[in-house]
């Protein structure tokens, strides 16, 4: 229902002396102060839906109706008036003033909302939406292919779970979600089940000490190939036991010990093929031959230079022993490469019980010994090569590379060469995203990779050991608050904004408390891999899982969306511009996140569970909240004039700051939203200019950015050979050269939010598609090229302002 923004609304009650307080009982049982602006807004909405002009006389009539309703409540009610009674009084007032068509529209709107509320908890309605392939349902998650049986089964189960969920939730929470005031995430899994969200599973304890998966007890692996295979099996089971992403934290350092076992075996083989009596020249020839075929064995492209000859670990040993060590290194490098390739293919070919590829992230980059370095190299080489004969960009795992001074940040650091490989990989495959070691420690209290795409644990010291613990911890769920709606409902009055804000935070807190309570109802036998065999802990069958959550070991997240839009209500839509912004506007936007952070700290101290502020990725929520607010408030400049809301604290995607300007604006927010954050920059094709990307990475590191993603054109058309940015269409994307949009004849890779996705194969919701279509580059450069039949080149170019 359309409503126009109210400006300068004043009621007689605002300036009247304090009299009897008029109270209202909401549908969810909450009691709040009567606010005449709500009636004025609703009646003006009915006028707008009828295209009726509101002049001075109509303004007076509407205001009189609101005052009459307040007076009648005072006369007729000793306690709070119910919402339904107030609506009846409004309808009666409209009829008495002969506004019959307005009364009918007002009544119909009320009836439609009652029907929507009933439908939300109707299982039959949920199933009907799925059968009718409601876009908001089948395109909610870009990682789910709704055409396949396993996903259809999951969507059916999710639809039933979601309908049941709103009957299980506290009334205030359920009502706020259905109205669009808040969003209770993942209601297709929780609270119907007691599942938790994302995590840093302790795969490393499981690999080291053994575990049971299904009917198979597993011992500790004796090679990196078995370690990689086992970890993908664990990932599959973890993905079936939680609904969020999972991350292999510091994978290069942990995998290194299994690569060392391969090296030891190859060294034994080297003693067999190079016995003590073997002439040195023959041994040297064997090593040269092994090195000569290495580029082919590692699938090097023709233009990639071969790796230099390896050096032995022990340079003081005799020459024959040195050659054995070099030969063992060459063989181990191949074993590492194959293991990382196995992991890449197994993760991408898995489809778990929830009908999707597991949301997996691999964090790496800090290992400096030979084995960890080779693991990093293998991860990059496999990702650069791509999947299959057409070398498709792998969507999973998400790669998160750590940059640290003294390790890889600067020329002269031992792993600086691997930073160069990371840059090459990012320009060709968009991943890795990068995290900056010292900045992550400053923001979150300790170092770790994100859980899934952007959720971060805070630093936590185990009171039993006094040591920092990251692996084996998790997030219990997210509730996101619709910040633009609060601003719209405030009608530009900041005092009113903060009043409504506090009310919404109270409901969001109640929702998060419910999430904690529900997760605590899980038992170890519900998810043995998580609770019994080491991913989260090694509990007994009847132990309480709460010991893994309390004392702030786990996190639960308060999310937000649309700071740009909310601030536009108070400072106008031009408060952010291509190259600068209104400092007062930024301070207001920052004050919202600061206030959320203060509340989370208070709740954590009072309850012993870690509440964190989370910059919600909003893959489909960007569509839902915006759509609901457009229905309620109409098209409001700077707020609902796009079909999406801006993610969290980000610079609006249609503006064109330089990468440095964008990061300068955004850098302060993660320090108050340490439970989840990421920054992005939009680049042209940078494969020929990786140093430009390195300059941005280095700048981000210098100014305190913690986590940075690279968005660059990497789409490919297999019909005409185009490489670059596919053009957005109404439903998807097409090749700008030949118009091809056949998912079997192109590879389109876009960042939906934190993860990458192929929107041609798996279309996304309308709002997210619109958001991607509105993105502009923050740097001038080529955005695509194709070689024509006559051998000439055609290029596409985007000019930054």
Q: Whereabouts are the PLM-identified features?
A:
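Charged, amphipathic alpha-helical regulatory modules used
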Residues: 2-133, 770, 774
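Short, hydrophobic beta-strand segments
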Residues: 22, 68-74, 360-361, 565, ...
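Conformational switch/transducer regions in large eukaryotic molecular machines and scaffolds
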Residues: 35, 729, 754-755
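Metallocofactor- and cofactor-centric catalytic cores in central/energy metabolism, strongly enriched
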Residues: 52, 334-340, 344, 569, ...
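Conserved catalytic cores of very large enzyme subunits
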Residues: 112-116, 120-552, 573, 579-582, ...
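Conserved phosphate/anionic-ligand binding catalytic regions in large, soluble enzymes, centered on
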Residues: 246, 472-476, 550-567, 624, ...
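Long insertion/accessory domains within large nucleic-acid-processing enzymes
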Residues: 739-800
């Amino acid at each position: 229902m359309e409503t126009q923004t109210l400006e300068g609304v004043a009621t007689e009650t605002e300036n009247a002396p304090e009299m009897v307080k008029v109270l209202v009982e909401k549908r969810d049982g909450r009691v709040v102060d009567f606010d005449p602006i709500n009636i004025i807004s609703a009646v003006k909405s009915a006028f707008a839906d009828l295209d009726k002009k509101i002049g001075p006389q109509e303004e007076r009539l509407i205001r009189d109706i609101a005052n009459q309703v307040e007076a009648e409540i005072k006369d007729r009610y000793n306690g709070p008036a119910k919402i339904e009674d107030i609506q009846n009084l409004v309808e009666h007032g409209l009829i008495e003033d002969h506004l019959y068509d307005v009364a009918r529209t007002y009544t119909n709107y009320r009836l439609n909302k009652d029907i929507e509320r009933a439908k939300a908890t109707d299982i039959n309605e949920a199933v009907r939406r799925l059968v009718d392939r409601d876009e908001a349902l089948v395109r909610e998650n870009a990682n789910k292919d709704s055409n396949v049986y396993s996903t259809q089964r999951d969507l059916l189960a999710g639809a039933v779970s979601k309908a049941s969920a709103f009957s299980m939730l506290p009334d205030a929470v359920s009502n706020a979600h259905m109205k669009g005031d808040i969003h209770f995430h993942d209601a297709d899994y929780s609270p119907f089940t007691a599942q938790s969200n994302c995590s840093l599973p302790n795969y490393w304890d499981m690999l080291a000490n053994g575990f049971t998966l299904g009917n198979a007890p597993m011992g500790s692996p004796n090679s990196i190939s078995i370690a990689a295979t086992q970890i993908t099996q664990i990932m599959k089971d973890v993905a079936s036991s939680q609904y969020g992403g999972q991350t292999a934290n510091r994978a290069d350092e942990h995998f290194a010990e299994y690569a060392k076992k391969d090296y030891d075996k190859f060294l034994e083989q080297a003693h067999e093929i190079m016995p003590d009596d073997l002439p040195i020249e023959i041994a040297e020839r064997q090593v040269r031959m092994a090195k000569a075929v290495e580029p082919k064995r590692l699938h090097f492209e023709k233009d990639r230079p071969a790796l230099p000859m390896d050096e032995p670990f022990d340079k003081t040993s005799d020459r024959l022993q040195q050659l054995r060590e070099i030969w063992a290194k060459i063989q181990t490098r191949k074993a590492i490469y194959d293991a990382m390739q196995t992991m890449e293919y197994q993760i991408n070919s898995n489809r778990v019980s929830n009908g999707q590829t597991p949301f997996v992230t691999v964090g790496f980059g800090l290992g400096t010994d030979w084995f960890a370095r080779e693991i990093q190299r293998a991860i990059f080489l496999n990702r650069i090569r791509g999947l299959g004969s057409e070398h498709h960009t792998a969507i999973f795992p998400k790669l998160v590379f750590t940059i640290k001074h003294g390790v890889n940040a600067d020329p002269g650091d031992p792993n600086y060469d691997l930073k160069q490989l990371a840059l090459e990989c990012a320009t060709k495959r968009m991943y890795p995203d990068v995290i900056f070691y010292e900045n992550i420690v400053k923001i979150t209290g300790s170092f770790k990779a994100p859980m899934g795409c952007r959720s971060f644990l805070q630093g936590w010291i185990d009171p039993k050991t006094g040591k920092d613990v990251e692996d084996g911890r998790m997030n219990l769920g997210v509730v996101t608050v619709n910040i633009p709606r609060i601003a719209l409902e405030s009608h530009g009055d900041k005092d009113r904004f903060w009043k409504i804000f506090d009310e919404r935070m109270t409901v969001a807190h109640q929702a998060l408390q419910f999430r904690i309570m529900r997760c605590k109802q899980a038992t170890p036998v519900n998810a043995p891999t998580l609770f019994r065999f080491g991913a989260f802990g090694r509990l007994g069958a009847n132990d309480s899982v709460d010991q893994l959550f309390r004392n702030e070991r786990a996190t639960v997240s308060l999310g937000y969306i649309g700071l740009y839009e909310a601030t536009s209500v108070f400072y106008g839509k031009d408060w952010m511009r291509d190259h600068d912004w209104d400092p007062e506007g930024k301070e207001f936007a920052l004050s919202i996140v600061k206030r959320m952070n203060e509340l989370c700290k208070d709740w954590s101290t009072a309850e012993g569970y870690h509440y964190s502020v989370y910059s919600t990725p909003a893959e489909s929520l960007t569509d839902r909240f915006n759509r609901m607010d457009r229905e309620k408030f109409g098209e409001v400049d700077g707020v609902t004039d796009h079909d999406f809301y801006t993610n969290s604290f980000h610079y609006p995607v249609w503006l064109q700051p330089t990468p440095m300007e964008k990061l300068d604006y955004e850098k302060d927010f993660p320090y108050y939203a340490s439970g989840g954050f990421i920054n992005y920059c939009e680049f042209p094709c940078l494969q020929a200019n990786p140093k430009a990307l390195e300059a941005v990475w280095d700048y981000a590191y210098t100014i305190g950015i913690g986590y940075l993603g690279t968005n660059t054109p990497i789409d490919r058309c297999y019909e005409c050979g185009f490489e670059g940015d596919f053009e957005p269409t109404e439903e998807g994307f097409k090749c700008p050269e030949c118009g091809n949009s056949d998912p079997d004849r192109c590879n389109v890779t876009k960042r939906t939010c934190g993860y990458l996705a192929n929107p041609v194969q798996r279309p996304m919701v309308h709002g997210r598609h619109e958001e991607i279509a509105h993105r502009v580059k923050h740097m001038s450069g080529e955005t695509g090229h194709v070689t024509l039949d006559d051998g000439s080149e055609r290029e596409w170019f985007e000019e930054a302002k």
